[in-house]
Amino acid sequence: MLQPKKTKFRRQQKGRMKGFAQRGNQLSFGSFGIKSLQSKWITGRQIEAARIAVTRYMQRQGQVWVRIFPDKPITKKGEGVRMGKGKGAPEGFVAPITPGRIIFEVEGVPYEIAKEALRLAAQKLPVTTKFVVRHDYDIQNQNA
């Protein structure tokens, strides 16, 4: 499961996710990717399930980049515990995602395979996504 090795503080405030992604909103490594269209928290398990779906469909060809990392600690109080008496114990980590954020990137496979692999990955995620292609990628001459 994805999580930081060490954090400065064990607990963090929930915060608000407003606006669009200011960073990580363009393809940097691969020719294809999926971009978020919603704000949501994505857990390490969801990221890993999507990554496995991509690599299995691509049959270990090409390369996959995961552009997000769950570094925000989430806390939860025990069952049946009343309100107050402090914040709960850390339960896990999430990656806060805003619209426009690139989640996965793929390189080294044809357009159709990349599109289907990323569609399968998108089904594992709690956000609606959009398939994006690098602006200088030529779909007609991909095998040339």
UniProtKB/Swiss-Prot annotation:
Organism superkingdom: Bacteria
Coiled coil: none
Oligomeric form and interacting partners: Part of the 50S ribosomal subunit.
A Pfam family the protein falls into: Ribosomal_L16
Organism of this sequence: Porphyromonas gingivalis (strain ATCC BAA-308 / W83)
GO molecular function: rRNA binding; structural constituent of ribosome; tRNA binding
Identification of the protein by name: Large ribosomal subunit protein uL16
PROSITE patterns: RIBOSOMAL_L16_2
Keywords of the record: Ribonucleoprotein, Ribosomal protein, RNA-binding, rRNA-binding, tRNA-binding
Biological classification of the source: Bacteria, Pseudomonadati, Bacteroidota, Bacteroidia, Bacteroidales
GO biological process: translation
Family as reported in the entry's similarity comment: Belongs to the universal ribosomal protein uL16 family.
Gene3D superfamilies: Ribosomal protein L10e/L16
Its biological purpose: Binds 23S rRNA and is also seen to make contacts with the A and possibly P site tRNAs.
GO cellular component: cytosolic large ribosomal subunit
